[in-house]
Amino acid sequence: TQSRSSAASDVYKRQELYGEIRNFFSLPLETKRSYEIPGIGGQRGYVSFGTEHAKGRKEGDLKEFWHFGQYVSEDSKYASEYPENVQVKELPKFNAVGKEAYQMLEKTGVYVLRALALRLGLDEFYFDNYAKDGNSILRPIHYPPITSEPANAIRAAAHGDINLITLLMGAQGKGLQVQNHEGEWIDAIAESDELVINVGDMLSRHTNNKLKSTIHQVVNPPRELWGTSRYSVPFFMHPVSDMPLNCLENCIDAENPKQFEDITSGEYLYERLVDLGLIKKSVSYTHLRAHETKAN
């Protein structure tokens, strides 16, 4: 009975989350854009339709999204790095529901990383201190109805995620595809009570490509479904900014020599935000960090 009660509670929380997300994206564009914060690379608040594009592409993805970020205590050494979460005054439950989902998925992500650590021959708790107060992001995404034939853009072009791992709840609408080892695209459909877990580029880099990044895309629906929205809520699990992403020694050998230069997760994130079009290269990594400190 307790497990049934817990399952029912999870269903309610998931429905409540998607309800709040729909409510937000249904707000007038002018209202949503009032929550678009300049100068922080889209790390908190609203990011408008077509702003983000995949690495190596110029066409903006056919989506708009929101970012919930880390909730740190004031005495955390990372507190000054993170912009504050943006409060939506029109929706009194939106931020609380988002925070609860963020913290539940973060907790789940820690357990996934522990399992991966054991698989990699590391201490089970290797990732724990890097994940605590990490720069993780919960991103509710809205792919609006398609109103005309897109020239080259799709809902989300093929890409790998930046972070360590991504936890993705069953989306409201199909379209997610992942690329298998043969280079073929296959549909990735999670049920409402399941999670899709992707390996991100940071973990791929840290393991010297022993764990390969999950390349995925969100394709446009068939014409008869153009009038439908798609909603998705990925949780991007990032480490703290000073985590070294140097290739692990036990992932380097004669058959798999070191493939990546040493870099911290913060520096790597900056490079990728430039690639995505979320910040301009004229904004240096140190300037961005200074702005984040000021924003807090």
Identify the function of each model-found stretch:
Residues 1-2, 8-15, 286-293:
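Conserved small/polar residues in nucleotide/adenosyl-binding loops
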Residues 6-7, 127, 153, 168-263:
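Catalytic core of Fe(II)/2-oxoglutarate
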Residues 6-103:
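Non-heme Fe(II)-dependent double-stranded beta-helix
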Residues 21-32, 70, 105, 109-113, ...:
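A generic secondary-structure signal for well-formed alpha-helical elements
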Residues 37-43, 71-74, 97-177, 219-225:
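Conserved double-stranded beta-helix
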Residues 49, 63-71, 141-143, 170, ...:
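Structured loops at beta-to-helix junctions and adjacent beta-edge loops in soluble globular domains
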Residues 57-60, 132, 160, 190, ...:
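Extracellular/periplasmic catalytic domains that process cell-envelope and extracellular macromolecules
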Residues 266-289:
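C-terminal helix/juxtamembrane-tail motif
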